[in-house]
Design a protein with these regions (language model features):
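Active-site phosphate-binding/coordination module
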Residues: 18-129
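Surface-exposed amphipathic alpha-helices with a cationic face
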Residues: 26-34, 97, 173, 215-219, ...
Length: 283
């Protein structure tokens, strides 16, 4: 197989939960570039949040917001941009407030919420630690009023709770305009930055996934999916891993993701799982 494009998730794949990047991962990325293979970052983060890493890795393309935005990074050209409508945002926000669920909204350069908590508090602390200010944090009094007045360009809404969110799936299933990803990392989402157990739903416009972003790049670059390699760890990586010619799951990945992978690494993320995958399939 002649690999022409390698797509990788960031958090939990190249970067571990402590925001550490194994040194060998940088060497592996250099190897990709030296072989003239396109390197694509696929992440749930917005471009404003991931830009520094994209620059650091010299990525050719970026799929951001789980597929809501695709950018040709070398030519600074936006290829795709999708957002949630005002009506759908109000639908989501009203529901969250009704059941006392935490909600925050991602625009392409802002995080909007009524209170920093859970994932958005984690992002704020990570950004503070990194000394980065690409993502602005906007605290509003009432998120529904803010949506009504300003109609922000939101690509993703995130609802969080300290217990299971599965009971709310049916509410979002009846809205054909939106789709959601249920994030559950080995039972509960917990790390060394926010010492609290919680789960979250990442809600975006319908038919938007990382894999759809790769399908677009497949057509844009005239590269068959069979000539692509995809690496990831969580449920929002599953389709791209399943549909790529070579799909790699890091050993830290969820069981569902490992079940569809061509290869599962022996090393953990902190030990250079990404580099292991690259070195196995690139001679």
């Amino acid at each position: 197989m002649d690999i022409k494009l390698i797509a990788s998730d960031l958090d939990g794949t190249i970067i571990d939960r402590d925001n550490f990047i194994a040194p060998e991962n940088f060497q592996a990325i250099d190897k990709i570039h030296n072989k003239n293979i396109y390197f694509t970052i696929c992440t749930g983060k917005s471009y404003s949040v991931a830009k520094n890493l994209c620059d650091r890795f010299h990525a050719d393309f970026g799929i951001f917001g789980n597929g809501t935005q695709v950018i040709d990074l070398k030519n600074e050209k936006e290829l795709i941009r999708k957002t949630l409508s005002r009506e759908d945002l109000l639908y989501i926000a009203t529901f969250a407030k009704r059941f006392d669920l935490h909600i925050h909204l991602y625009t392409y350069n802002e995080l909007i919420t009524e209170e920093l908590k859970y994932l958005d508090l984690r992002n704020f602390k990570l950004q503070t630690l990194a000394g980065s200010s690409n993502l602005k944090f906007k605290i509003v009094k009432d998120i529904c009023d803010y949506i009504n007045e300003y109609n922000p360009e939101v690509f993703s809404a995130v609802i969080s709770k300290e217990s299971t969110l599965k009971e709310f799936f049916s509410f979002f299933n009846i809205n054909e305009n939106i789709t959601y990803t249920y994030i559950n990392k080995k039972g509960k989402y917990r790390d060394n930055i926010i010492d609290k157990e919680y789960e979250y739903l990442n809600i975006s416009p319908t038919h938007i996934t990382k894999d759809e972003g790769l399908t677009f790049l497949s057509e844009y670059l005239n590269i068959p999916k069979e000539d692509m390699m995809a690496i990831g760890d969580n449920i929002n990586d599953l389709e791209m891993i399943q549909n790529a010619g070579i799909g790699v799951a890091v050993v830290d990945a969820t069981d569902d993701v490992k079940a569809v992978a061509t290869y599962v690494t022996e090393k953990r993320v902190s030990e250079g799982a990404f580099a292991e995958a690259i070195n196995k399939f690139l001679n």
